[in-house]
């Protein structure tokens, strides 16, 4: 019997299944384990990155990072280090194939079902390739598990009904680890300073124009909004650079669009060089946001 029986990839924040292996095991115990895995997937955000839920015949292992988690049903004979090495390899394969925007925009279950081909390939590798060929990878995972043991549950702990777990009110455990970004660069700091300066200029001009327009006419409302909307967009660009946010690329494009349209609308109140300066800063900030990635270690568990 295989050590790794089933695997799936889910979105952490809501447990949406993104892909899964098309395995056909019809034993009652296995189907019950599948049901509990689905329940556990809905609560992954409550647990740290790695965890295991053990039952009488099968065990569930999960490993999550960013907004993607990989889960597996294994036989009890499967070593924990092998299971987590498998999950980490699967995670890297998935994130290399689909970016965070695709994952964040997924709206239906199994939107990436074609990834099953990769799951089967990785699963076959870990089930049938000699463990001596993976000694370095397994040894590294074993060391990590010693220093940071996974959360250990029972399969009964995963059964939740109406907010009650095993007769007790469901308590939220510590949240998933916060996302750590790459260090801020000198060019990134410059983009922040310029963005704050542009935001301040937009706010000052917008407030000044609003005070004047209240006494004169309502035709200036468009100009006021053309100052204030880019002000908000500049501040949000600073936030996107400093902190991780899902669907970051889409948000960056929207903020850049707001700033560009606002400045083009203000061509009568700003000269060409002022407009080019504001748009140039917006492009610089957008570039810095998209090039600053999450800090994460590379996996040694190759296929």
Curated annotation (Swiss-Prot):
Signal peptide: none annotated. Residues 1-183, 245-248, 292-303 are cytoplasmic. Residues 205-223, 270 are lumenal. GO terms for cellular component: endoplasmic reticulum membrane. The chain crosses the membrane at residues 184-204, 224-244, 249-269, 271-291. The keyword Transport applies. Pfam families: Longin. Keywords: Endoplasmic reticulum, ER-Golgi transport, Membrane, Protein transport, Transmembrane, Transmembrane helix, Transport. It is found in: Endoplasmic reticulum membrane. GO terms for biological process: endoplasmic reticulum to Golgi vesicle-mediated transport; protein transport. SUPFAM superfamilies: SNARE-like. It comes from the Eukaryota. Residues 8-119 form the Longin domain. It is a multi-pass membrane protein. CDD domains: Longin. The keyword Membrane applies. Belongs to the synaptobrevin family. PANTHER family: LONGIN DOMAIN-CONTAINING PROTEIN, VESICLE-TRAFFICKING PROTEIN SEC22C. May be involved in vesicle transport between the ER and the Golgi complex. This is Vesicle-trafficking protein SEC22c. It comes from Bos taurus.
């Amino acid at each position: 019997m295989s050590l790794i029986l089933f695997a799936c990839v889910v979105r952490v924040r809501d447990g949406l299944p993104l892909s899964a292996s098309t395995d056909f095991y019809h034993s009652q115990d296995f189907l019950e384990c599948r049901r509990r895995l689905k329940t556990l997937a809905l609560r992954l955000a409550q647990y740290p990155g790695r965890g295991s839920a053990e039952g009488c015949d099968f065990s569930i292992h999960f490993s999550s990072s960013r907004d993607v988690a990989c889960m597996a049903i294994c036989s009890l004979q499967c070593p924990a280090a092998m299971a987590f090495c498998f999950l980490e390899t699967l995670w890297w394969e998935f994130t290399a194939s689909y970016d965070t925007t695709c994952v964040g925009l997924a709206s239906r279950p199994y939107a990436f079902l074609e990834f099953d081909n990769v799951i089967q390939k990785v699963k076959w590798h870990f089930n049938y390739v000699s463990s001596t060929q993976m000694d370095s990878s397994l040894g590294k995972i074993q060391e990590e598990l010693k220093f940071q043991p996974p959360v250990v549950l029972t399969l009964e702990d995963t059964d939740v009904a109406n907010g009650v777990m095993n007769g007790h009110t469901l308590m939220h455990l510590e949240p998933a680890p916060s996302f750590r970004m790459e260090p801020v660069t000198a060019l990134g700091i410059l983009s922040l300073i310029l963005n704050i300066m542009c935001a301040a200029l937009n706010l000052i001009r917008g407030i000044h124009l609003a005070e004047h327009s209240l006494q004169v006419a309502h035709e200036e409302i468009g100009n006021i909004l053309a100052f204030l909307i880019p002000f908000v967009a500049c501040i949000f660009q600073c936030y996107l650079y400093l902190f991780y946010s899902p669907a970051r690329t889409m948000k960056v494009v929207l903020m850049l669009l707001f700033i560009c349209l606002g400045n083009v609308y203000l061509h009568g109140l700003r000269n060409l060089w002022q407009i080019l300066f504001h748009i140039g800063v917006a492009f610089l900030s957008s570039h810095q946001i998209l090039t600053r990635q999450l800090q994460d270690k590379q996996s040694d568990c190759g296929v």
